[in-house]
Amino acid sequence: MTDTTTNRVVSLKALLEAGVHFGHQTKRWNPKMRPFIFTDRNGIHIIDLQQTVTSLQSAYRFVADAVAGGGKVLFVGTKKQAQEAVRDEATRSNQLYVTQRWMGGLLTNFSTIKRRLQFLHDLEARRDRGEFNLVTKAEALKLEDEIVKLNRVFGGIKTMERLPAAMFVIDPHKETLAISEAKKLGIPVVAMVDTNCDPDPIDYPIPSNDDAIRAIRLMAGKIADAALEGQNRRQSQHIEERALAEQTKYEEDAF
């Protein structure tokens, strides 16, 4: 696995340093991951990083295009070692995230979730207007506790006004419910797939160690970079369209 490919998304050196190539024990593998496995060493499967590079490039292009088209990406990583990276990278790229337990119906029953989000927004607005000062101290504390509780569950999706254009998952083996909801709604799924995963339900599988914190942060960071690229493209397009509209208006007014 020599680094013969120059590519702007990620290098083999970066993947190696993050431990992306380390899979699970050979006895814990999913045979469907065979095409993504390079070899095994001391009872551990070693992921083919050339395929990781290619897969990540495809996922990167897809995410950038989805965001450039006005969509949002929902990052999902509820296991402990994924939570911080998922929260940080989704926030950095102005995307959505879930790091606590996946709430059933979050996507498939989004109308109900939207009502809960509106309730949270209303509570925070009341607090910001000073309305909590107009109720008893006990009632104010109860309302503050409700805000904290709702933010713990919904904090990463507070700005979600419609269904996401894509989902990025850290560990499909753990996030089966989230993936199931996305598939029912036709939402494309990008995911890190370790050697114990089933890649079949994933639209853009990225073969990778999904347990090592450095590997998770690297991949989440690249998907966040793709989202930022998409945002920049969208903003540039809006600027060009606005300039064209102003030029057209100027020419019309001149006649």
Swiss-Prot record:
<dbReference type="InterPro" id="IPR001865">
    <property type="entry name" value="Ribosomal_uS2"/>
</dbReference>
<dbReference type="GO" id="GO:0022627">
    <property type="term" value="C:cytosolic small ribosomal subunit"/>
</dbReference>
<keyword id="KW-0689">Ribosomal protein</keyword>
<dbReference type="Pfam" id="PF00318">
    <property type="entry name" value="Ribosomal_S2"/>
</dbReference>
<keyword id="KW-0687">Ribonucleoprotein</keyword>
<dbReference type="InterPro" id="IPR023591">
    <property type="entry name" value="Ribosomal_uS2_flav_dom_sf"/>
</dbReference>
<dbReference type="InterPro" id="IPR005706">
    <property type="entry name" value="Ribosomal_uS2_bac/mit/plastid"/>
</dbReference>
<protein>
    <recommendedName>
        <fullName>Small ribosomal subunit protein uS2</fullName>
    </recommendedName>
</protein>
<dbReference type="GO" id="GO:0006412">
    <property type="term" value="P:translation"/>
</dbReference>
<dbReference type="GO" id="GO:0003735">
    <property type="term" value="F:structural constituent of ribosome"/>
</dbReference>
<dbReference type="InterPro" id="IPR018130">
    <property type="entry name" value="Ribosomal_uS2_CS"/>
</dbReference>
<comment type="similarity">
    <text>Belongs to the universal ribosomal protein uS2 family.</text>
</comment>
